[in-house]
Curated annotation (Swiss-Prot):
It comes from Rhizobium meliloti (strain 1021). This is Large ribosomal subunit protein uL1. One of its GO terms (molecular function) is tRNA binding. Belongs to the universal ribosomal protein uL1 family. Keywords: Repressor, Ribonucleoprotein, Ribosomal protein, RNA-binding, rRNA-binding, Translation regulation, tRNA-binding. One of its GO terms (cellular component) is cytosolic large ribosomal subunit. It comes from the Bacteria. PANTHER family: 54S RIBOSOMAL PROTEIN L1, MITOCHONDRIAL (PTHR36427), LARGE RIBOSOMAL SUBUNIT PROTEIN UL1M (PTHR36427:SF3). Part of the 50S ribosomal subunit. Pfam families: Ribosomal_L1 (PF00687). InterPro entries: Ribosom_uL1_bac-type (IPR005878), Ribosomal_uL1 (IPR002143), Ribosomal_uL1-like (IPR023674), Ribosomal_uL1/biogenesis (IPR028364), Ribosomal_uL1_3-a/b-sand (IPR016095), Ribosomal_uL1_CS (IPR023673). GO terms for biological process: regulation of translation; translation. Binds directly to 23S rRNA. The L1 stalk is quite mobile in the ribosome, and is involved in E site tRNA release. Protein L1 is also a translational repressor protein, it controls the translation of the L11 operon by binding to its mRNA.
């Protein structure tokens, strides 16, 4: 514990918690302070001016990060027949129909992302209480209920990240690893931020992006000037 506390304290040296950093400087500082013995995940959090308790202020979507996430993603596909074969050929890790529903209902979830063909949704709908709280329920709005099984599987494994605003108006995601070069991390952050901005709901009033922060798994969070994150 003492070693961990010492590392955390050292990682905070040279960081001003009150300063609003430009994205480039923030990414550089976060990378420099990601000194754990594992490849830390770099995360971005955006505080939005929305109240997700209202349906017209919900923010959700999916973005394909240009440089991937750096993590291996296990994908499950609910499909039958030719579409099940297509899913396997595309690289899905788990494929099935009724039997897969039973396995998931039994509490075994050996995957990170879930895709379903439209005809499977009456069955998959039974898994709402299991998959919903984990943010894994297939949804056509984010491309996980689709007949394009190949495209969905490849997107999921290639860097697709789903996002959904939480109760406090915060949306966050892991957008890469500390081992990524700074430019790749910046590109991923900009892609994520642009997707969140484009997903601005009709009910959002006033300042939409209030605060942005970037951090690593074990490092301090740095405040980022929202004006520096747009890819435009």
């Amino acid at each position: 514990m003492a070693k961990i506390a010492k590392r955390v304290q050292k990682s905070r040296e040279g960081v001003d918690p009150t300063k609003l950093y430009g994205l480039t400087e923030a990414v550089t500082l976060v990378k420099e302070r990601a000194t754990a013995k594992f490849d830390e995940t770099i995360e971005v959090a955006m505080n939005l001016g929305v109240d997700p308790r209202h349906a017209d202020q919900m923010v959700r979507g999916v973005v394909n990060l240009p440089n991937g996430t750096g993590r291996s993603v296990r994908v499950a596909v609910f499909a039958r027949g030719a579409k099940a074969d297509e899913a396997k050929a595309a690289g899905a890790d788990v494929v099935g129909a009724e039997e897969l529903v039973e396995i998931v209902q039994g509490g075994k979830i050996d995957f990170d992302r879930c895709i379903a063909t439209p005809d499977m949704m009456p069955l998959v709908g039974r898994l709402g209480k299991v998959l919903g709280p984990r943010g894994m329920m297939p949804n056509p709005k984010v491309g996980t209920v689709t007949m394009d099984v190949t495209g969905a599987v490849k997107a999921s494994k290639g860097g697709a990240v789903e996002f959904r605003v939480e109760k406090a108006g915060i949306v966050h995601a892991g957008i890469g690893k500390a081992s990524f070069d700074a430019k790749a991390l910046e590109e991923n952050i900009r892609a994520f931020a642009d997707a969140v901005i484009k997903a601005k709901p009709t009910g959002a009033k006033g300042n939409y992006v209030k605060r942005v922060a970037v951090s690593s798994t074990m490092g301090p969070g740095l405040k980022v000037d929202p004006a520096t994150i747009s890819a435009a």
